[in-house]
Amino acid sequence: MILVIDVGNTNCTVGVYEKQKLLKHWRMTTDRHRTSDELGMTVLNFFSYANLTPSDIQGIIISSVVPPIMHAMETMCVRYFNIRPLIVGPGIKTGLNLKVDNPREIGSDRIVNAVAASEEYGTPVIVVDFGTATTFCYIDESGVYQGGAIAPGIMISTEALYNRAAKLPRVDIAESNQIIGKSTVASMQAGIFYGFVGQCEGIIAEIKKQSNASPVVVATGGLARMITEKSSAVDILDPFLTLKGLELLYRRNKPTTEK
């Protein structure tokens, strides 16, 4: 079995794979102040609930966009699983040709998603990840990662609206069926929701126009379902795209990481 860990700015997603099949998955809040023991106890609690033990795990791979938490994560893997994890970063075999100014700047989550989407759905492909930031990545018909766009995520924008507009309340992010709100809260929710649907459709359309291609569009991330249910611009919703990419990258790099 393989343990895959995706460390995002808001949440960490943990999954267990066996023979390329996702058996279990969990989510925990990303807290950069957590110790390795706190992380270990959380993961072991997940395992206990699923009748798994640390000895079931033969390898671990981690993707992280939160550098301060990585020392604790790596220590946790060694202390509780006796495994030195594979870290997605420079030197890892991805199978992608990165045609960008500085490949080291690309977030590991974007690389992982691009690997998974290219393998699972073919190229050309656009990957939209609705996370803390909303990211758009374009991989052309030759499998070349051409770059993309990064926009503030839904939660960031919602909090900014509350923090910078004195008379506007904090609101929950919710799907809205009416663009014309009848109250301040309803108007904010409509603006936030339809604003991000429009952002998604507009950026996808512009990528298609500038690339002169007809890529398949794959969406992932915690808020992807809510947005994509209102948008015809997305072809495929894959909530486990990042975990799939991690498992695939582990197999591509397995000879140097398995215990």
Curated annotation (Swiss-Prot):
Q: Which cofactor does it need?
A: NH4(+); K(+)
Record-annotated active site = D109 (proton acceptor)
| Binding sites annotated in the UniProt record for substrate | G107, S108, D109, R110, T184
Which GO molecular-function terms appear in the entry? Answer: ATP binding; metal ion binding; pantothenate kinase activity
Pfam families given for it? Pan_kinase
Example GO BP: coenzyme A biosynthetic process
The terms describing its cellular component in GO are: cytoplasm
Name the pathway it acts in: Cofactor biosynthesis; coenzyme A biosynthesis; CoA from (R)-pantothenate: step 1/5
Which transformation does this protein catalyse, written as a reaction?
A: (R)-pantothenate + ATP = (R)-4'-phosphopantothenate + ADP + H(+)
Q: What is its EC number?
A: 2.7.1.33
Q: Where does K(+) bind?
A: D129
Explain how, and how many, cofactor molecules are bound: A monovalent cation. Ammonium or potassium.
- The UniProt record gives the binding positions of ATP as D6, V7, G8, N9, T10, N11, C12, T13, T132
| UniProt keyword annotations, A-Z | ATP-binding, Coenzyme A biosynthesis, Cytoplasm, Kinase, Metal-binding, Nucleotide-binding, Potassium, Transferase
What does the UniProt entry say about where the protein is found? Cytoplasm
Give the main location. Answer: cytoplasm
The role this protein plays is: Catalyzes the phosphorylation of pantothenate (Pan), the first step in CoA biosynthesis.
User: What is known about its subunit structure?
Assistant: Homodimer.
The entry sums up its family as follows: Belongs to the type III pantothenate kinase family.
Q: Entry's NCBIfam families?
A: baf (TIGR00671), PRK13318.1-1 (NF009843), PRK13318.1-5 (NF009847), PRK13318.1-6 (NF009848), PRK13321.1 (NF009855)
The name this protein goes by in its record: Type III pantothenate kinase
Organism expressing this protein natively? Listeria monocytogenes serotype 4a (strain HCC23)
Q: Which gene name does the record give?
A: coaX
